[in-house]
Swiss-Prot record:
The keyword NAD appears for this protein: no
Protein name, as recorded: Outer-membrane lipoprotein carrier protein
InterPro entries for the chain: LolA/LolB/LppX, OM_lipoprot_carrier_LolA-like, OM_lipoprot_carrier_LolA_Pbac
Gene Ontology CC annotation, any one: outer membrane-bounded periplasmic space
Gene3D superfamilies attached to this UniProt entry: Lipoprotein localisation LolA/LolB/LppX
Keyword Methyltransferase included in the entry's annotation: no
CDD domains assigned: LolA
Organism: Ectopseudomonas mendocina (strain ymp)
Signal peptide from the UniProt entry: 1-21
GO BP field: lipoprotein localization to outer membrane; lipoprotein transport
Similarity comment text for this entry: Belongs to the LolA family.
Domain of life the protein comes from: Bacteria
Amino acid sequence: MRVIRLLMLAALSFTLLTAQADEEAATKRLTELLSQAQTISARFSQLTLDASGTQLQETAGQLVLKRPGLFRWHTDEPMEQLLVSNGQKVWLYDPDLEQVTIQSLDQRLTHTPALLLSGDVSQIRENFEIDYKEGGSVVDFILKPKAKDSLFDSLRLSFRNRMLNDMQLIDSIGQRTNILFLNVKMNEPVEDHLFTFDIPEGADVIQE
């Protein structure tokens, strides 16, 4: 009986060590791919589906990211909307409503997915359980938040030929948001003024 217990403990220890090694390898690989880009600019296409697969929304636009923590997410189809962060504040501008919402940037990666691409990559291991699979030129990472109050249940990041290709977020009710990145450019000069926002005259301002 003692021998069986020892064998079971040994098997369990081996399983835990293997899982830890796999996660360390996944973290190292993801950190490597994210760290290679100090700036990213791309066209994006975003599709949101409910749990049954019914389309809820389709949008498209342009994004610009710069480390550490700067991003500009400009939706131009079907209706314009602009999300800008200078690393401390976030401005959300809706031209149709002539409304600007201002709030402090939530530095938690589980609440601000854009920071996965533009923030401090050293925080990834602290915030997520990470798994990955690699085949040919494609690498897929599955990130599951450790925090219970995360805005999503899981996030998939895919790279093709070391370039960011697409992202998928799944929330607690099964809603899926698929984002495809097109014409991706890395490490090209990006003007800092893109990450500031001047409030248009006459716009309503909501401070949160």
